[in-house]
Amino acid sequence: MKIAFLFLTLDNINWHYYWDKYFDGHNSKYSIYVHPKYPEKVTVPWMKKNIIKNLVNTEWGIIVKAYINLMEEAMKDPKNMKFITISESCIPYQSFDNFYNFLKKDNIKTSYIKSLPIKSYDWKERIKKQKNYKDIKHWRKHLARFCLSRYHVQILLQKKEELKLFYKMHVADEFFLSLLPSSKFIKDFSVTYDNWDYIENEIKKINKKIEKLYIKLENEKVNNNKNKINNKINDYKSLKAKISANPKSYIKVYKKDFNDVNNSKAFFWRKFPKNSNINNFKNKILEKI
């Protein structure tokens, strides 16, 4: 059994030396496939030599076709039995052996997809705006980082017509696995830890501030002051929309953050931008992988 690592990036992965250590000594157990937005900027050797030929334009929220192209290329190797999506801000957090053995203990058909609740906004602004959305019998929302079995990738790639709906749908990377039938071979588990709890708490704080401003607005008599309050409300709404688009970005990492990822049992961790201080904990991470 081999694991196909599907890297979807802008150019280089942000923290490649963690991956250097992760892959070291396991050559026969993995394959690498890379879809960069800017292939000419890729300099990491193991990424550069594994860039797939069929590249497509990507932007935030529009990446499903790139995922499919990565899967199609990875399926050419019959030894690839598991397919995991990796972003540029992701680092490994457990050893390769730990992940490999975790995958082997379940049925070979098993995929790991973390489900999310479909909110009213999703139905209104994303799903129902698709012309043929009713053709999808059972909509599923999920994290965009997942690990699929060869069994499920085969099913997915056979649905060429149905996939077209997701190529232009915004944030379809959180919905396109709706094409997979419900199955005992799908486990509700995220192999990659994203800190959405932090974002939810920040949104709650913003909502409280907005609520207080609305109360203040009701009691305000001066029009000029009303305009100022409305501007503040709109600023908070814009901030809420901005931060709700992504999980926490770890520019500053603290010791307590490790408790969260440890409790999740995940094998990978994100998001770490290039200006993160994650290297303050370099030895701690290298010891784990």
Question: For each of these PLM feature ranges, what is it?
Answer:
Residues 1-289:
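ER/Golgi luminal nucleotide-sugar-dependent glycosyltransferases, focusing on the catalytic module
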